[in-house]
Amino acid sequence: MARITVEDCLQQIPNRFLLVMVAAKRTKQLYKGGQPLIENKSNNKRVVHCLREIAAGKVDYEIPARKA
């Protein structure tokens, strides 16, 4: 399988900083036993698997409203 790049993920989440936050949270979910959203055919590490999920458009995120 081809290498995953930040540019692949930025097509789904256009802000680099938000991408890092979403990827970190999703990776923690996988480490705590969360179910993978795509098949891990290459037996990648959880961080790489998380980035593949984001690039595939399988990870949803929501920006919380600011408190006034």
From Swiss-Prot:
GO terms for cellular component: DNA-directed RNA polymerase complex
Protein's name according to its UniProt entry: DNA-directed RNA polymerase subunit omega
Listed NCBIfam families: rpoZ (TIGR00690)
E.C. numbers: 2.7.7.6
Superkingdom: Bacteria
UniProt cross-references to Gene3D superfamilies, sorted A to Z: 3.90.940.10
One Pfam family named in its UniProt record: RNA_pol_Rpb6
Family per record: Belongs to the RNA polymerase subunit omega family.
A GO molecular-function annotation: DNA binding
Keyword Transcription among record annotations: yes
GO BP of this protein: DNA-templated transcription
Reaction(s) catalysed (UniProt annotation): RNA(n) + a ribonucleoside 5'-triphosphate = RNA(n+1) + diphosphate
Upper taxonomic lineage: Bacteria, Pseudomonadati, Thermodesulfobacteriota, Desulfuromonadia, Desulfuromonadales
Assembly mode: The RNAP catalytic core consists of 2 alpha, 1 beta, 1 beta' and 1 omega subunit. When a sigma factor is associated with the core the holoenzyme is formed, which can initiate transcription.
Function field: Promotes RNA polymerase assembly. Latches the N- and C-terminal regions of the beta' subunit thereby facilitating its interaction with the beta and alpha subunits.
Entry-linked HAMAP family: RNApol_bact_RpoZ (MF_00366)
Alphabetized UniProt keyword annotations: DNA-directed RNA polymerase, Nucleotidyltransferase, Transcription, Transferase
Name of the gene: rpoZ
